[in-house]
Structure formats: structure tokens, C-alpha cells
A protein has these predicted regions:
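Non-Sec secretion/translocation targeting segments of pathogen effectors
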Residues: 227-230
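Non-catalytic, low-structured ubiquitin/UBL-interacting segments
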Residues: 1
Length: 230
């Protein structure tokens, strides 16, 4: 009886067959975005689910295509002046790298502007099609490479700007992007020797936004807005 129990415990503890590359320098992460509907909020929602530090810049007035950026995203700050382009510029230059998630190529509108601005400012930028079968692997491997290439030898957090189309431009992209990012973060937590959680100066886990706020995010197409939105 005892032998059978021990065998069951051994079977349950079998190592996963997934073999993943590991960075040489495990680092905490911070996820930022402009708080727009769609990919921006998917990045924040996925980070919130893992208590990863979040932040970023919103347009002046916290503008978004559904009105204003939800109060649940209280770590986001308003740009002192300017609109969507100013928000984009500040998030790019305040980040170590930018991840762009899209349904189709080529990039257009504000998404294309984000990629162009990152290139002009020497910031790494990765564009991933959510429909790619290996989208999760692409993102995971790129993030691992950043842990070694961004300020090599340092242990400070890496700031990742997550960007892409708004919800009305790619209906359903919030859920697709969030699902993909949750898979990436799960890989890090389970298999990569650590997780992406925000860590304070004393090495303690920091839960920056309660997970309950994930539920207030809407996937419904917003009402018409007369101002150009990106």
C-alpha cells in the first residue's frame, strides 16, 4: 500500500517534457501601455493576473475610444499635454522594448507609428501575429533574450511596452492578446526558473492592481467617437 502511494507521488512529480531556453539573468518585469481598448488593456490585464507591476502614460484627460481609461488602471499616468501620439512617444521612450501584437500585416495607423518611433529611438521592437501557431514561443524567446541584452549584468526590472490595435479596429483582439500573454507569463512562472512578478527593493512580491479589476474590462465595441483614435 505504501509502495503504491510512493509510486503515485513519484508519477505526479514527473518533470514536464517541455524544454525551454533560460536566460542567464532572471529579471523582474514591468508591463506598460497607453490604456487604450484592445491590445493595450490586454497587456495590463494579463500582467494584473500575475501581480506584475504595471504602468504607462495615457493621453491628457485619460482619453480612450470608449471614453476614458478605466480607474482600475490607477498606475497609469496622464501626459501633461498632448493626445494619442504623445502618449505613444512617452511609452516608447520610457520602456526598454516594445511588443506589438496584431491580427494582420502590414501595420497601420497608430500601431505603425509605434513601431516607427521605437526604431527611430533605438528601442527593440517585436511584432507578432496572434494567428501564428508559435506566437507564444516567439514572445517568450524574445523576452528571454532581452533579460540578457538589456543592461547586461544588471538585475533591475525590464520595462516592456505592449501595443497594438484598439478593439474597434480588430474586434476580439483584447481576448486573443490577453490569452496569448497569459500563456507567455505562465511559461515563465512554471518553467523558466522564476516568474515575472514585480519585486520591490526588499525582494518582496508586489500586487499593484487587484485582479478584480480584470472583470471590469469590456470587449464590446465602443460607441462612435468623433476624434481620431489610435
Amino acid at each position: 500500500m505504501s509502495n503504491n502511494k510512493n509510486q503515485e507521488e513519484t508519477d505526479d512529480a514527473t518533470e514536464p517534457i517541455v524544454s525551454l531556453p533560460k536566460s542567464k539573468n532572471r529579471r523582474p518585469w514591468k508591463i506598460v501601455s497607453g490604456g487604450q481598448t484592445g491590445v493595450d488593456r490586454a497587456g495590463l490585464a494579463a500582467a494584473m493576473s500575475y501581480s506584475i507591476e504595471t504602468g504607462g502614460w495615457t493621453p491628457c484627460g485619460r482619453l480612450a475610444e470608449d471614453g476614458v481609461v478605466p480607474e482600475g488602471f490607477y498606475t497609469l499616468k496622464e501626459c501633461p499635454t498632448g493626445g494619442f501620439r504623445e502618449r505613444t512617444r512617452m511609452n516608447v521612450v520610457d520602456s526598454d522594448a516594445t511588443l506589438i501584437l496584431v491580427d494582420t500585416l502590414p501595420l497601420t495607423g497608430g500601431t505603425a507609428y509605434t513601431a516607427d518611433y521605437a526604431a527611430k529611438n533605438g528601442r527593440p521592437c517585436k511584432v507578432v501575429l496572434l494567428s501564428d501557431a508559435d506566437a507564444v514561443i516567439q514572445i517568450r524567446d524574445w523576452m528571454l533574450s532581452l533579460e540578457d541584452s538589456v543592461r547586461p549584468g544588471q538585475t533591475d526590472r525590464i520595462v516592456l511596452n505592449v501595443a497594438g490595435p484598439r478593439e474597434s479596429g480588430s474586434p476580439g483582439i483584447f481576448e486573443r492578446a490577453k490569452k496569448t500573454l497569459l500563456s507567455v507569463f505562465t511559461f515563465f512562472r512554471n518553467y523558466s526558473g522564476g516568474d515575472l512578478s514585480a519585486i520591490d527593493d526588499n525582494g518582496n512580491l508586489v500586487a499593484w492592481i487587484d485582479a478584480e479589476f480584470v472583470g471590469v474590462l469590456s470587449d464590446e465595441p465602443p460607441a462612435a467617437h468623433t476624434e481620431e483614435l489610435e
